[in-house]
């Protein structure tokens, strides 16, 4: 519903490679997306590479965002300031999955014309099944063709 194309061959960036980010990357890759995942620690970056995704240091996001079509944020801290949002093409979709304060300012993203969807606070630790079902709904909603 959010895209007019499927996720197949779509350039996606996932910010954070914890429980939610790593699960999301696996599912996006299974749908044929070109997945870049970001993390802070070298061990996480190595795991991203070993899992078959393109790793990116979260402090060096600019190149990964150039031409990116969908950004999923799982980091509950401001990691997408305005200067990085400006790297995204105008038709990009930003999906906020992290709890407050989230990764970017929704008002700034929307003022720039980006499509911003807020789906924060997935309770992965308290209710992993429910969190997984909700995340599945978000993912299933993305690859549909626009009618």
Region annotations inferred by a language model:
Residues 48-123:
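Rossmann-like adenosine-cofactor binding region
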Residues 18, 40-42, 100:
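Residues in the short beta-alpha loop(s) of Rossmann-like NAD(P)-binding domains
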